[in-house]
Amino acid sequence: MKTKMIITALFATLSFTSCVNLMSKQNVPQQVKNLDNEKVIKQSLALKDFHAISNAIGIDVYYTQSAAYSVSVEGTEQCIAQAKLEVTDGVLNIMNRYAHFYNTSSYSLKVYISAPSIDQISNNGALDFYGDINQSKSLAISNQGSFDYDKGTVRAGYVSIDNNGSLDIDNPMQITDSLRINNYGSLDINNDMNIAGSVHINNNGSFDIDKMMHITGSAFINNYGSFDGSFGLKGRDFEVSNYGSFDSHLTADCDHIKVNSFGSTDMDITGTTKQISINDKGSTDIDTTQLKVLK
C-alpha cells in the first residue's frame, strides 16, 4: 500500500515529540492546547493523485475541478495542529491526529481542494461540502455522520447515495444514467434532480424531497420508513412498495404504475398511463381523478 502523508503544523512552539504515537490516538497534548487559537492561517500541503475524499472530523470542504492537484488547510494554529491529511490508495483522508479535538475558537477548519475529478465522498464526521462535480462516469456519496452538500452542481452518469446519518443535498443534480439511494438515516433533497434513466430507492429512515425528482425512465421505490416527495416520470414504470408512511405526488407520462400499500400510503397521481394497479393492504388514500388511463 502506497501512502503519501503530510504532517501538518510543525510550528516552532510544537516539538516533534508532541506528534509521536499517532496511531494510538492519545489525548490532545498540552503543547497543542497552548497554541494560538485566534489568528487564522493557511497552509498548503503537497498532496496529489487522489480521486476520492474521506472525512472523519468537523470541517468545511471547498472543491474546485482543475487539471492540477492542490490541497490547503485554513484555521487557527491549534486546529491545524490537530488535523491529519494523507493520501492512501487514491483517497484523500481527513482525520483527527488525536483521540479528541480541542478547539476554543468559533472559527471552523476549512480545506480547499483542487483535483481533475472526484468520484467518491465519504463522511464519518461533520462535513459541509461546496463545489461543482462534473464527473462523466459515476459519483458515490456515503455518509455516517452529518453531511451538508451546500452549494454546487453535480453532473454524472451514475450516482449512488448511502446514508446512515444526517444528509442534506441542497444542490441540483443532472444524472445521465441512473440513481441508487439507500437511506437508513435522515435524508433531505432540497433541489431538483434530473435523471435520464432508472431510479432505485430503498428507504428505512426519514426521506424528504422538497422540490421534484424528474425521471426519464423508470422508478422503483421500497419504503419502510417515512417518505415525503414529488416525482415527475416520463418513461416506462413507476413502482412503489410501501410498508411505512409514504406521502407523494406523481406527475406521470408512463406505461405502468404499480402501488403496493402495506402501510400508510397517501398519493396524488396526475397525467397519463397505459396501466395502473393498486394492491391495498394497508391504510391507502390514492387520488387518481386527474389521471388518464390510455386505451
Model regions: which residues?
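Intrinsically disordered, low-complexity terminal regions
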Residues: 1-295
